Amino acid sequence: MFCSAGCSYQKQEPEGYSESNRRNIFTTRNAIDRIAVILSGQARPHTLRRYAVIRGAFAKFLGRDDQRDPGAVPTIIVGLGNPGAKYEGTRHNVGFWCIDRIAESYPGGSTRSHRLVHTSEQNVAGHCVVLAKPRTYVNESGRAITSLSTRFRATAKNLIVVYDEMALPSGKVRIRARGGDGGHNGMKSIIGAVGTQEFVRIRIGIGRPEGQVGDIEHVLSRPSEEERRAIDEGIDRAIDAIVMALSEGVERAMNVYN
């Protein structure tokens, strides 16, 4: 279901190194890669994420980033949110927070900005993925998805969408392989754009508004410190669910993390 092809690497000679030194460096890199192969069958997702930080730092030291195999269709992980400083830290931007956290956990990607979407091509636990943050408002997220689908020749089966959910308590995570929009206008826009409900979605709870606070005011306001801690824990859990979905399939991830 998901792209499992390993990312290829574009070789670039580090300044100041002889040919023999470069051979030694690349031998060390290959040894680290072999360790990752061993870990990938035994380690928990957070262990693989720690390894990825080392690998990403090594890639930057060598002056080269992980790149997608041009012939492979990557898994596209889209986090929903509103662009601009005005909306930073608001509940409706939980999807953005998750994408940023994945990028921090798996450094060394190739980042680009387009008219409708920011993207970063990453190697996440041995899988080629595109992390995406739409530059449209949440209610128009489908436009960004259409752009991504065209650029990467992707279909709904290559898509994972991460977004906020009022129907869940703060930090609660739910992963599904398909479903309706649940009243979320961003999801409604995406379903209309791709023409199907058959794609993976991960919801992170932000809780319902209290008192006289309306839904719109709630999602566009910032959570309390206690809520933020719960949401951050939910984001970590969502990332572990994504890694498991990539490595073992979405059904396995649903059984473990729902």
What do the predicted segments below correspond to?
Residues 8, 22, 43-49:
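Short, low-complexity intrinsically disordered segments enriched in A/P/G/S/L with frequent Arg
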Residues 10-15:
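Short, charge-rich patches within N-terminal targeting peptides
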Residues 24-34:
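Short, composition-biased linear "edge" segments at structural boundaries
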Residues 48-178, 187-203, 209-214, 229-236, ...:
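Nucleotide and nucleotide-moiety/phosphate-recognizing core
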Residues 174-180, 219-222:
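Short glycine-enriched, charge-decorated loop/helix-capping segments at active-site entrances
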Residues 225-226:
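A hydrophobic, small-residue-rich beta->alpha segment in the mid-to-C-terminal subdomain
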